[in-house]
Amino acid sequence: RFAEKAERELIHVCNFSDWDPVHYLDVAEMTTAVAIGYDWLYDVLAPSTRQLVVHSIKTKALDLVVEEYKTGNADSWAKRETNWNVVCNTGMVLGALAIEEHYPELAKHIIGEAVRYIPNCLKHFAPDGVCYEGPAYWGYTNMYLSLLLKALNDNLGEDFGISEMVGVDKSVLYYMHSTSPSGKIFNFANSGSTAPAAEPIYFYFSRAFNQPEVAAFYRDILSKTVQSGNYFRFYFLSIPWYDTASSPADALPKLKVYEGINDIIVFNGNRNIPNSLYLIAKTGDPDMAHQQLDIGTFIIETNGIRWTDDLGSDNYGLPGFWDYKPDGQRWTYFRNSNFSHNTLSIDHRLQNSAGTGEIDRLDNKAAQPFVTMDMSTTYAGQSRFVYRTFRMLDDVRILVTDSIGLQNPSQSVQWSVITSANVECKGNTAVLKKDGKSFSLKIVSPVDAFFTARAAKRGTEAEKPIEGYTILSASVSGEPVQVIKVLLSGE
């Protein structure tokens, strides 16, 4: 019964006139599905269906990619430095392997070209496995990377060094350790904050790189997924890839930094005590794919409650949404701007998308571990320097210190966070309340600074609605160098 249904679906999609080559991700995903169906169902497919599938994979996918490899420029889907590269090339490799017995030279050529260009994307995983495109595209990229590595190793006995690229083996460990105590992800870039994707990426990596803690992490996700019924499309591979390996949980370091285009900074309080803090922050490079003006932003949690938020992505079809230039229309949309993030603005102006954030100093061995970001180029033309320091005073308190050298004392600096909690402001103190718990923010300096709160609102009617979020902010001015210190406390 199931085989008959699957065969009907294969026949149906193979009779499409094309697989939407103008958006080649569609071709790649369809080729992946058809190749897997053809391989798994080969023995029960009618000869006419096999012939149709082989013809469709060749004419609707593989024949098209030969020319792309030959003439495509650096921004071609086959060669670019984003998720498109891995997803599209993986789809072509799976299609080539599926029909290799019919077209061996074509398959050899496509596999050779794919493994040549896939490193263009994966080089950005160095050194610590961070996918700069954010967690949503981490999942998309690594799911197809898992399919690629499994197919190459199973069929050809090697993956041509792809799995040995710096950072690839660390990628799932990074993602696992940057998942918060509430089970949510650090949803920077165009990502939502939902729990980690229930994809079998974890089982592939746990086996390939001998990481039993990854398998244990994913089994917990799987059990919750089964209970919720919220299955992802590659969920079925969790069965053949299942990994029973177990490992005791390692003690979490107070401060861990994962370096990359987006440096990810993670502070962990002792989770065995009430109100312990979890804080995760980032540097970044806003003009890279899917980035927002969010350098210096941070998410903080206590008691499994997220106190500062990220609104995620807006509609991809908005005019100018993909214009990353400093004056690009992308930055006029609220969710993409620094005004919607937990960071700074100077004179209520946008961060500079051509700027970057970098780690300046850190000490993860100190009794009070700290990390300092240099965000100066992010505010080019607005300031002389900008540094943000996070210092963990103890398990329940973190001090955020911003040092801003302004061009003149008449300028103002806005310090802000966005939250879904209820907010009570009283001078230099704000108390956030949610689910029967509370969290406090206190401005330590300047002594005359105070908090205000306002509802978060989208910039235009075309943007996604925003409901239930508050912007908590403080504005300071009057000095050529501003030092803003805010104490975050779960007490």
What residues fall within each predicted segment?
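Carbohydrate-active enzyme catalytic cores, enriched for enzymes
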Residues: 99, 140-307, 360, 364-368, ...
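Secondary-structure capping and boundary motifs in well-ordered enzyme cores
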Residues: 23-26, 81-88, 106, 110-117, ...
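CBM-like, beta-strand-rich accessory domains located in the C-terminal region of large
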Residues: 218, 224, 319-491
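Active-site-adjacent structural elements in enzyme catalytic domains
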Residues: 1-39, 47-60, 170-173
